[in-house]
């Protein structure tokens, strides 16, 4: 068994995906070097009151050279939507077989200002 990890920041905060609609995703989680991340839970909260937001997840670590080669939206490994003022919960059953080699980057289908995007919590196992 590997390490159980999540993406809660040292300050208790979670990343919000807002304007990431071009070539650089929002970093949601960075793997420990040399380990892969197997998500078992993703909780996404849409803070906007009117817009369905589609999340596009890619396998990338934006801070390490060579680990961001697959950061483009066209390299999506998983997609899901979140209704306005709603929460999408994806469990181990939904995420079965999904593995991130470098980390999780996320794009938003629409450009939103801070406070109107999608906040994403991820938990899983690194091994």
Tell me the role of every PLM-derived stretch.
Residues 49-74:
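Short, surface-exposed beta-strand/strand-loop-strand elements in extracellular ectodomains
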Residues 24-27, 76, 89-92:
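Short structured motifs
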């Amino acid at each position: 068994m590997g390490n159980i990890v999540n993406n809660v920041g040292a300050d208790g905060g979670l990343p919000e995906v807002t304007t990431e609609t071009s070539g650089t995703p929002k970093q949601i989680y960075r793997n420990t070097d040399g380990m892969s991340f197997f998500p078992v839970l993703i909780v996404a909260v849409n803070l906007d009151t009117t817009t369905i937001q589609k999340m596009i997840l890619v396998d990338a670590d934006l801070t390490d050279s060579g680990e961001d080669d697959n950061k483009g939206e066209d390299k999506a490994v998983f997609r899901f939507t979140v209704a306005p003022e709603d929460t999408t919960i994806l469990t181990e059953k939904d995420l079965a077989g999904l593995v991130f080699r470098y980390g999780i980057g996320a794009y938003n289908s629409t450009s939103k200002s801070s406070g109107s995007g999608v906040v994403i919590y991820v938990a899983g196992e690194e091994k």
